[in-house]
Amino acid sequence: MWNRRRNQALDGLDDEIRDHIERETEINIARGMSPDEARRQARIAFGSVALVHEDARAAWSWSWVEQAGQDLRFGARILKNSPGLSVTAAVLIALVVGINTTIFSMVNALVTQPAPGVKPEGLVRIAIPERPGAPLVNYSDYLDYREQTTALQSLTAFTNSRVTVASDSGSYAMWTAPVDANFFDTVGVRPVRGRAFTAAEGRSTDTAGLVAVVSYRAWQDVFGGDEDVVGRSIAINSRPATVIGVAPPSFSGTMLNERTDVWLPLLMYLGTLSRETSQRSMTDRNDTPVDVIGRLAPGKSIAAAQADFATMQARLDRSYPTADRPRVAVVQYAATAGGLIPSGAPTLLAIFSVITLMTVVIVSANVANLMLSRAVARQRETAVRQSLGASRIRIVRLLLAEGLSISVVAWLAACLLTIWAARAIPRLLPDSPFGQAGIDFGPDWKVVVYAMVLAAIGTIAFSLAPALRVWRQDALPWLKAGEHSVAPGRSRLSNGLVVLQLAFSVVLLTLAGLATRSVSLMTVDLGFDSQNLLLLTARITGSVTTRESSLALIDRIQERLQVIPGVHRVSYVRSFFPTTQMVRTAGAAEALRATMHVVGPGYFPTMGLSPVAGRPLTIADRERAGAVAMINQNLANALWPGQNPLGKTMSLRMLTFRGESDEQVERVEVVGVTPNAFVGGFNPERPDPRPNLIFISEQRAFGGPGRDPAAPGEITFYLRHGDSDLESVASALGPVLREVDPRVAIVSTQTMDTRLDNVTFSARVIARLLLIFSLISLLIAAIGQYAVIAFNMRRRVREFGVRIALGASARQVLSTVLREAFGLTAVGLLVGLLLSVGVAFAIRGALFGVTPTDGPTYAGVFALLGCVALMACCVPALAATRVNPVQALRQE
C-alpha cells in the first residue's frame, strides 16, 4: 500500500512538472521567443527533472532500502553471469563455514546442551569451583539448603550408582539415580505411565516399601513394553521393589553422558546399604556428597540465588564449624558431558578457536584473490561507472553485495553440511564416547547464528581487497589503459594474500604434526601383552551375603570361565576402578601416592607378568594372619631406594577427593616386586604417567570400611584367549554366568586394546581434525598460489614474448617464474614459522613427549609445503616457456 501511494504521488509530481514547464513556456512565447526556444529556456530554468524525481523519491520513500535491493539484484546477476568463479568461491566458503560450524555444534552440544526431556528454563546447578567434577554438597547440608532457601522454588538432590536389576527376563546391570522425592517436579519431567515419588516415599528409609521409576528404554528392553508394567515386582540388588512409573522416552537423566535406567528414592536407597554406611550418610556432614540442582523462584536471578546460598553457608559455618564445607556457586544448568570433555578443555577450545580463525582467514584470502581478479577484469567497467557519476561508496556497496550473494549461498550450504555431519558423527563413531552417549549434535539457534557470523566475517574479509582497490582507483587512467594493463598494486595485494594463506597453512600443519607426534608417542610399551585379552565386568549379588559365599561365587565363575574353549588363563580384579592409597614407611617424612588393585589368583600369569623379586600372590594368602602385597619396581625404588623391599612393611590409608580418609591405617608386608607395567592403561594427562602400583589379594587381614568382600560390587575378569577365539569366547560368557548364578549381571565386555584406545580417544580425534583442517587449508593455499602465479604469467605475456624474441631460453623463462613463486613460498614459510613457534609454545601444556620446537615436525612441514608449492607453480611456469613471441607482441 505504501508503494502504491508513493507511485501515485510521483505520478502527480510528473503532472505538476509538466504544468509548470508549459506555463513557463507560454510566458517565454509571450516575451517573443519561438516555441522551441521558449520550451528550452523553460527546461533550463526548471533544472534537471531526473534530479527532482530523485529528491522526491528520497523524501517520500526509504531510498536506502531500494538501493540495497538494487545492489543485491546486481550481485545476483553477477553470480549468474560468472558461474565458475561464483561457484568456486561459494564452495570454499561453504566448506570452511560448514566444518567450523560442525565443530562448534559439537562443543555447543557437549557444553551447553540441556539433557533431553529436561525443562531448562530457570534450572540452576550448585557447583564447587575448586572441585570440578567432584560430588558437591553433603546430604545434611542439602537438607538445610532445601528448607532455608528463598531464591529457589525447589531444590533437589541426586547421585548415581550401578545396581543389578532382576526381572522375569533376567538380570541386568543398570545405572540408577537415587533422588529426592521432588526430583521429577524440579527438572520438569512427568512419567508417561504411573507416577513419580511422593513426599512420604522421599522421607521413608523403609526398604520394604522400595519403589522405582524405570526409563522408557528399560520398559522396552527389560519388560518388553508391557502395558501393565506399573505395579510389577523387580529386585534391585536382591531387594524387592515395585515399579510405580515409566519416564518419557526423551529423558534418561540430567547429564548427557549418563543414561539412567532406574530412579529410586534417595533415603530408601541409603537404607539398602549397611547400617553403618546408611547412618553415616544421613548424619555426617563430611560424608555422602550429592549433586544438587534447583529451579529459580519467579522474579529471582542467579545473582540473587548466589547471595542466598552465601547467607545460608555462613549460617551453617557458625553452626557446624568443624565440617569440611567448600564455597559453592550457583550456575546455569547445563548437561555437560563431563566424561567426554578432557581435563584440558580450555586449552582444546583455544586450539579450536585458533583453527577456526586461521581457516576462515585462509579461505577468505583465497576468495579475496578470486574477487580481486574479477575486479581487475572489470576495471574499465568500474571506471566508466565512476565517470558517469557513481560514487566510490556506491561501487564498494556493489562489491559487498556480490560478496553477500556468495555468502548467502555458502551459508545455506554450510547449514546443510552441518546437519548432515551432526547425524553422521554418532554413526561414524558408534563405539566412541560420543556415539555411546547418544548426544544430539544437531544445530540450534546458537549454531545457526555462529554460521551467520562466520559467513559475515568472510563476506567483509574477501570483499575488502577489491573494495580497497576501487577506493584508491582513478577512473581516467583506466579509461585510457589497454585491456591487459594491471597496476602493480594488484600484484602486491595478491602476493600478500598468498603469503598470508601459506603462513597460516604452516601454522595448521605444525599443530597437526605436533598433535600427531604426541599421539604416536602415547603408544608406549605397556609392560604386558594387551592382545588377546578380554575383559568381562559383572555385578555379583544374590547369594553374596557373607565373605565366604562371595569368594565361593567368584571362584565358581572363574572355574567355569577357565573351561570355555579357547580360554587359556582367567583371573580377576575386584574393582574396575582401582583405589588410590597414601603409602608411608617407618621414618618417612612424606607419604607417597599409589594405585591399589585387589586381584585374584593367577592374575600375574594371565597378564603375562613375572615377579622380578619375591613371589606372586596365591590363594593361600586369603587366610593369612597379616596382610601381604606385591608392589611394582617404581614404588619399591621410591620407598626403599637401594634396599631389598621384601619383608618390609608399609602403611596404607585410602585417599578420597576430600583428602586422606579417617579409616584405620592398614599395615601390609611386601612379599614380591613386579615389573613396571601400565596394567590400568596409559594416562597421558598424568604428570608422571608411570604410576606406583600395589597389588593385594582377597585377604581377611585386609579390612576396613568399604572393603568387605561380601558387599555387592563389580568384578572384572581377565580372560586370555587364542588369536581367533574372541567371538566364540565372548558369545559364551552370558550362558556361563547364568549357569553359575542367574542373578549375576554382565556390565560390559571389551578387549583390553579397546579399553586402552579409549584413554587416548580425545587426543586422536583432535590430531585427526587438525590433520584434516591443515590439509584442506594447504590445498586451498596451493590453489590460491597457482591462481596468482597464473595471473601474473598472463599479465607478463608480452614481457616473456620479448624475452624469448631476444634469445632467452625456456630454462631462463622457467627460472624467472619459479623464482617469483618460491619467493612467495619462502616468505610464507618464514612468517608461518614465527607464528607456529608462538602458537606451539602457547599450547605446550596439551603436548605429550614433544617440544614446541620439535625438529622432525618442522622439517616435515617445510618439505610438504615445498612440494605442494612446486606442483602449484609448475603449470603456469611451463606455460610461460611456451609463449609464442609473435602472438604475444601483437597483443594490445
What function would you assign to each model-found segment?
Residues 106, 368, 403-475, 514-517, ...:
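Small-residue-rich transmembrane alpha-helices
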